[in-house]
Amino acid sequence: MAQFFKAKPNTSKQLSSKLSLKVTQLDHLGAGIAHHDGKIVFINGALPGETVSVQLTEQKKKFARAKLLKIDKASAQRVSPLCPHFDKCGGCDLQHLDIDAQRKHKASTLVDLVNKFAQTQAGEVCDTLSDNAWHYRRRARLATWFDKNTKHISLGFRASSSSDVVEIQSCAVLAEPLSALIPDLAFMLNQLSGKKALGHVELTQADNGNFVVLRVTKALSDKDKARLVEFANKHQVIVLLQDDDAQCEHLNGAGEQPYYGFDDNQVKLNFSPGNFIQVNAQVNQAMVSQAVEWLSPKADERVLDLFCGIGNFSLPLAKDGAEVIGVEGVQAMVEQARINAKQSGLDKVSFYHADLSADLSKEPWLGKVDKMLIDPARAGAYESMQSLKKLKPKALVYVSCNPASLARDSEVILKQGYQLKKIGLVDMFPQTHHLESMALFELKN
């Protein structure tokens, strides 16, 4: 069972004590939990069942933190991290735990959170939606850091709890074609005369090819652009430059926009560098299919999709004839969603830009809502759920990337006359403590 604690502000005391502790469980962020002097001790990198030597680094009234020094007795679920950058990079924090144990822990965390904070039983716990444990990310944003002394630009990810950039040669969770680009890309960027103007680098694997987006703070020279085009042609990628106003310049590819599709591209979603997409293509397909199955929208029903983005759920929900209303807080994604619907030949889908923290029941375009789907950011949809009683959808699917927000919002939903019928883990981010989930609520009676 996962444990959850809310730390209250208190003055920290730095300690140097070295202790031998027995780890009993993991917390919801993947840290090992032990006990000492009546306090909970959090130990990053430690696993349940292990005996470890640690050094206390922080102590507060009810808990302490410790640095892992040595594993005296290892868990049978401990594995060697695949990534050579694991001990420095802040991207993956559970590579040392067997993948089956990772998923079991996440599922337990999800159910425990909902049971505890929503004060309800989780209903039917569905099978975990999962796919490959490695090389699953179709998109990643790499950081850059320019060393003024050496004139070298580093390309990599941020270190854990730090702004430092860990220079990498590969990434074990990034799609293999994208991971393979990193060494040559880093070398090429260091050849640019304008490398000091480079910001982050976004790598994307779309259904129509691989894309490299370079954020630049000022224009690059024609010579630098020629080097980038040479790199693009050699590696068969499309390279774009993105300025501070998020405007993109294609250096090759004739303005081609990345896309991904469903159902053999009968439904196709184009997206831009600034648009949000789910990074795990295979799990996203399974998640969308499950959402459509759970809601089973009929041709005479109206479905409301809040936080709809570019139409990831809206378009598949409309495929069998239901009328779908997608609402999004970012105007650019609303415009892209409308284009995607038109290109997919779906004329019963409409998209609107709105403040999702406001009461949408008064919007003239809303009307009757038979069923509903929400897919909010980590902050959840607490404000949006306040008007649920006015809309009264028969069924609601909540897609969550933060189990704490889901648990909090579930309490609001239940108080408005709904019951939790199904819940399930969506393992969108293997090798990390992050978890996606889905819950189905149905109106009572």
UniProtKB/Swiss-Prot annotation:
Reactions it catalyzes: uridine(1939) in 23S rRNA + S-adenosyl-L-methionine = 5-methyluridine(1939) in 23S rRNA + S-adenosyl-L-homocysteine + H(+)
GO biological process, one term: rRNA base methylation
InterPro entries with a match to the protein in the record: 23S_rRNA_MeTrfase_RlmD, MeTrfase_TrmA_AS, MeTrfase_TrmA_CS, NA-bd_OB-fold, SAM-dependent_MTases_sf, TRAM_dom, U5_MeTrfase_fam
TRAM domain span: 12-70
Keyword Iron carried by entry: yes
Transmembrane segments: none
Amino acids binding S-adenosyl-L-methionine: 278, 307, 312, 328, 355, 375
Residues binding [4Fe-4S] cluster: 83, 89, 92, 171
Pfam family, one: TRAM
Record keywords, A-Z: 4Fe-4S, Iron, Iron-sulfur, Metal-binding, Methyltransferase, rRNA processing, S-adenosyl-L-methionine, Transferase
Enzyme superclass (EC): transferase
Active-site residues, record numbering mapped to chain: 401 (nucleophile)
A single MF term (Gene Ontology): rRNA (uridine-C5-)-methyltransferase activity
E.C. number(s) listed in UniProt: 2.1.1.190
Family statement: Belongs to the class I-like SAM-binding methyltransferase superfamily. RNA M5U methyltransferase family. RlmD subfamily.
Annotated function: Catalyzes the formation of 5-methyl-uridine at position 1939 (m5U1939) in 23S rRNA.
PANTHER family: 23S RRNA (URACIL(1939)-C(5))-METHYLTRANSFERASE RLMD (PTHR11061:SF49), RNA M5U METHYLTRANSFERASE (PTHR11061)
Name listed for the protein in its UniProt record: 23S rRNA (uracil(1939)-C(5))-methyltransferase RlmD
Species this chain originates from: Shewanella halifaxensis (strain HAW-EB4)
